[in-house]
């Protein structure tokens, strides 16, 4: 009985989601996809045979430091730059987005050759940096402090772990449009198309590149190849002192740790615990 009740609730939730779409999309049916760590994702199939991608964002974006209005602003610009899939319907207040369907796999499932990845991502960054700089800023110190303040329980080991980093001084000399989550799951095909712009804001490009290195499992040489390819495409260095990305590696680890702690409080599970353990180890 419990299984039937759960299935009925799921069907009702999907019907309610379809009802929020304008015609003709509400006449379709939904197929749940493997969701990310924060969103619910679906393939929307229409009677015509066409498909679309439907994303329902996290219900508490403020807790995760997400600004929906800025996400939508950057997304619209990214479509114009050929970075993001065309959007047919959006409700920034709830994080609902209906996009073109893309059959190309993400880089987790089918990564391009490793030697090509730095240049491909340099192309993403050069186009991204042509967009207007958002008014909302994601500065690493303030962003991490917001995450920490929202923790219901601070682990006993955290104060000693974070002390050295918080006593340091991070670069704060360049602010550009940033995606802030260019991990392999958010890159589709060889173009690549970039999805999940939730954490988009003005940010330091060095943090963006440091985040790429960590989430792609790169060595320093691949990060340096990306930076060199960027300078060649852009016709010069970024900012007055370059990317300075090495200085942001511990900030990527720290923010990743706090994010995973926040998510684990809300929904404990092995995926979040693995991220906690990994980032804690990197900071030790």
Residue ranges and their predicted role:
Residues 8-25, 130-180, 184, 242, ...:
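An alpha-helical support segment within catalytic cores of ATP-dependent transferases
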Residues 21, 82, 125-133, 169, ...:
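A general structural signal marking secondary-structure boundaries and capping sites
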Residues 23-29, 235-245:
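Short, surface-exposed acidic
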Residues 31-137:
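ATP-binding pocket architecture of kinase catalytic cores
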Residues 34-46, 50-54, 165-207:
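Active-site acidic catalytic loop and adjacent metal/ATP-binding pocket
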Residues 68, 247-251:
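Start-of-helix signal in alpha-solenoid helical-repeat scaffolds, especially tetratricopeptide repeats
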Residues 206-236, 250-268:
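Active-site activation/catalytic loop segments of kinase-like enzymes and analogous catalytic loops
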């Amino acid at each position: 009985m419990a299984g039937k009740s759960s299935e009925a609730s799921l069907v009702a939730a999907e019907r309610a989601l379809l009802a929020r779409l304008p015609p003709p999309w509400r006449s379709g049916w939904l197929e749940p996809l493997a969701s990310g760590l924060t969103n619910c994702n679906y393939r929307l199939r229409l009677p015509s045979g066409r498909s679309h991608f439907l994303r329902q964002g996290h219900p508490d974006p403020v807790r995760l430091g997400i600004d929906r209005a800025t996400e939508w602003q950057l997304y619209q610009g990214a479509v114009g730059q050929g970075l993001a899939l065309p959007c047919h319907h959006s409700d920034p207040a709830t994080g609902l987005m209906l996009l073109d369907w893309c059959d190309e796999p993400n880089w987790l499932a089918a990564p391009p050759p490793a030697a090509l990845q730095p240049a491909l991502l340099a192309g993403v960054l050069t186009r991204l940096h042509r967009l207007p700089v958002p008014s909302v800023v994601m500065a690493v110190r303030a962003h991490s402090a917001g995450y920490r303040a929202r923790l219901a329980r601070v682990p006993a080991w955290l104060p000693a772990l974070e002390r050295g980093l918080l006593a340091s001084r991070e670069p704060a000399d360049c602010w550009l449009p940033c995606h802030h989550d260019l991990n392999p799951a958010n890159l589709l095909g060889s173009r690549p198309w970039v999805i999940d712009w939730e954490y988009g804001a003005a940010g330091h490009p060095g943090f963006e590149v440091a985040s790429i290195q960590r989430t792609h499992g790169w060595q320093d040489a691949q990060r340096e190849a990306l930076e060199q390819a960027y300078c060649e495409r852009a016709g010069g260095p970024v900012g007055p002192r370059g990317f300075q990305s090495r200085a942001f590696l511990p900030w990527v680890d720290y923010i990743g740790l706090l994010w995973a702690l926040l998510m684990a409080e809300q929904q404990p599970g092995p995926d979040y615990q693995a991220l906690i353990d990994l980032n804690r180890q990197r900071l030790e």
